[in-house]
């Protein structure tokens, strides 16, 4: 999950609210100090932190809870809404024909990000192409071409041409039939006059629908200075924050967005091609606090799963065979890394107890289960009760696993079957209310 340490610290602060006998000034002061400490450790700008904490404190002490909500729930909602406000609104990026200019510092991950954003549009049913305008970095052309070929998106570049403006002009003509054209400019330092002029010249070639600045989350509060310089040069319309999954200082990049009155368009949360997500403020904070992001989960499922991948209705009726579990594991593998999928679920305090080693072990276990099920007959997968000691030995031998691992799989299936039956009695989906959020977070 992005900004793991910040999320853990914020959840700890919110538990103090939920576990307090009453909400008074002393409790509010203590919680606000915890929030301040957590945000500053994540490299969020101090002025922004002070403004946030002042707003939370003022609202918590002066506002009366609305009808049907107690004081604990009300303060929790205040913290949640103010955290959403601090990250700002998302940059609207429509699923339609458009031209996008990508700018950023050297080493920000801009070239990879350009290809991943093209992949995002392809997943949505559009036809994207990336134009390579980086004529300075050795290997930029080859890297981007290989990425685009791998991801199945269009590519245009001129390996021997050093005139970036001419390349973009030609590329826009050649790729005119593509829905989305993404121009990957050379990485630069904001104070390099010649490169800034080149960027302005490219900007003057066409009406760009978006000018997206790529920021590496790890650069911390230096992001603000860079964002202002790029904004002054071409007027950026949105920010893409990369590598949020690998740094404790992502708050600096978030501060830069607020500091320049821009907004976030995409966030990079992993290394795979599908780990570039449209930014959703509510979902981002919800995931940060361990409340999950069911909207993102449903969106990811809709993108990668076929209609018949998982028979949900049959499973909810209580009939959950090994075939169903096999389909479920296949679906999980299609949707991406387990850690990322788990971050979209409302695990509350449980999520923070799962280490990276545990995720890896669990992912390996799931792969092992699939190998075991491949060694079963269709009848055995449809009715696990058929699998006695002799069949366990046969399946273990055929899969290269131990009999204990086969028994563990059968035990896991029983647990999942029981869980599916329990879900049958659950209420309709939708956003959780504050009481459910408190329970999910391990609060009283």
UniProtKB/Swiss-Prot annotation:
SUPFAM superfamilies: Domain of the SRP/SRP receptor G-proteins (SSF47364), P-loop containing nucleoside triphosphate hydrolases (SSF52540), Signal peptide-binding domain (SSF47446). Its EC number is 3.6.5.4. Keywords: Cytoplasm, GTP-binding, Hydrolase, Nucleotide-binding, Ribonucleoprotein, RNA-binding, Signal recognition particle. Its main location: cytoplasm. GO terms for cellular component: signal recognition particle. It is found in: Cytoplasm. InterPro entries: AAA+_ATPase, P-loop_NTPase, Signal_recog_part_SRP54_M_sf, Signal_recog_particl_SRP54_hlx, Signal_recog_particle_SRP54_M, SRP/SRP_N, SRP54, SRP54_GTPase_dom. GTP binds at residues 104-111, 184-188, 242-245. It catalyses: GTP + H2O = GDP + phosphate + H(+). Part of the signal recognition particle protein translocation system, which is composed of SRP and FtsY. Archaeal SRP consists of a 7S RNA molecule of 300 nucleotides and two protein subunits: SRP54 and SRP19. PANTHER family: SIGNAL RECOGNITION PARTICLE 54K PROTEIN SRP54, SIGNAL RECOGNITION PARTICLE SUBUNIT SRP54. Involved in targeting and insertion of nascent membrane proteins into the cytoplasmic membrane. Binds to the hydrophobic signal sequence of the ribosome-nascent chain (RNC) as it emerges from the ribosomes. The SRP-RNC complex is then targeted to the cytoplasmic membrane where it interacts with the SRP receptor FtsY. Belongs to the GTP-binding SRP family. SRP54 subfamily. Composed of three domains: the N-terminal N domain, which is responsible for interactions with the ribosome, the central G domain, which binds GTP, and the C-terminal M domain, which binds the RNA and the signal sequence of the RNC. HAMAP family: SRP54 (MF_00306). This is Signal recognition particle 54 kDa protein. It comes from Methanocella arvoryzae (strain DSM 22066 / NBRC 105507 / MRE50).
